[in-house]
Amino acid sequence: MKTSSLTIIFIAVIITIICLNIHDIEAREIEFNAGRVVRSEKDCIKHLQRCRENKDCCSKKCSRRGTNPEKRCR
């Protein structure tokens, strides 16, 4: 009885550790992607940067281009 209880507790601890490690890896990926977004807003190429609502464009001029409804800086 004691051996099976210890085995169950051991398995539960291992599963908990694995789940916490997976969550930590996902959190690092989110932080990495957020850092990349911040860098891309700072280092923008004027003719490729898309205009977004309530945000300034790199070139400060925003107009529609082509048939796509998305707006781009000029």
UniProtKB/Swiss-Prot annotation:
The record marks 72, 74 as: Essential for stimulation of [3H]ryanodine binding to RYR1. Residues 1-27 form the signal peptide. It is found in: Secreted. Residues 28-39 form a propeptide. Keywords: Calcium channel impairing toxin, Disulfide bond, Ion channel impairing toxin, Knottin, Neurotoxin, Ryanodine-sensitive calcium-release channel impairing toxin, Secreted, Signal, Toxin. Its main location: secreted. Expressed by the venom gland. One of its GO terms (molecular function) is calcium channel inhibitor activity. GO terms for cellular component: extracellular region. Residues 64-65 are annotated as: Essential for stimulation of [3H]ryanodine binding to RYR1. InterPro entries: Scorpion_calcine. Disulfide bonds join 44-58, 51-62, 57-73. It comes from the Eukaryota. This toxin activates ryanodine receptors RyR1 and RyR2 by inducing a long-lasting subconductance state (35% of the full conductance stateon RyR1). Furthermore, it triggers calcium release from sarcoplasmic vesicles (11.8 nM are enough to induce a sharp release on RyR1, and 55% of the total calcium is released after toxin (100 nM) addition on RyR1) probably by acting as a cell-penetrating peptide (CPP). In addition, it has been shown to dose-dependently stimulate ryanodine binding to RyR1 (EC(50)=14.8 nM). The presence of a 'disulfide through disulfide knot' structurally defines this protein as a knottin. Belongs to the scorpion calcin family. This is Hadrucalcin. It comes from Hoffmannihadrurus gertschi (Scorpion).
